[in-house]
Amino acid sequence: MDVATWAKSYARAWVEMDPEAAADLFTDDASYRSFIFDEPHIGRDGVRSYWSEVTSTQAEVQVTMGRPIVDGPRAAVEFWTTMENSGEEVTLVGCLLLTFDDDGQCRSLSEYYEFAEGRLDPPAAWGAL
């Protein structure tokens, strides 16, 4: 699987709030760091557990992924997400730093993001190279 296909699958799993589909994108021993200073979620079980927790408060999720920037097994992908989180409309914008194995499974993910209140649209040319 190439990085663009992986990113689309990640976005679909988020929109569908599907922890199993998300976990399937990762290696058995993957590291998923959702907060850079916290310990990572480890393996598919860790990803599944994390996604089950965070998506439980989300609704009306819309995700747009930017065009990946790829350098060998490493990639960076921006995301722009609007949703209801705990009943409040929010926009979540960020970047995923990813490392992949030879089969296109993600071995590591580090996530950097910011929240804003309300549903905001991306600026012109967002996510393009």
What annotation goes with each model-predicted range?
Residues A13, L25, V54-T57:
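Short alpha-helical functional segments enriched in proximate histidine and acidic residues
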Residues E16-S31:
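Short, well-ordered alpha-helical segments enriched in acidic and aromatic residues
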Residues S31-H41, T57:
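A short gly/proline-enriched turn/hairpin at secondary-structure junctions
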Residues D2, R48, S52-L129:
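A beta-strand edge to alpha-helix "cap/lid" segment located at domain peripheries
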Residues T5-A13:
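Solvent-exposed, amphipathic alpha-helical segments
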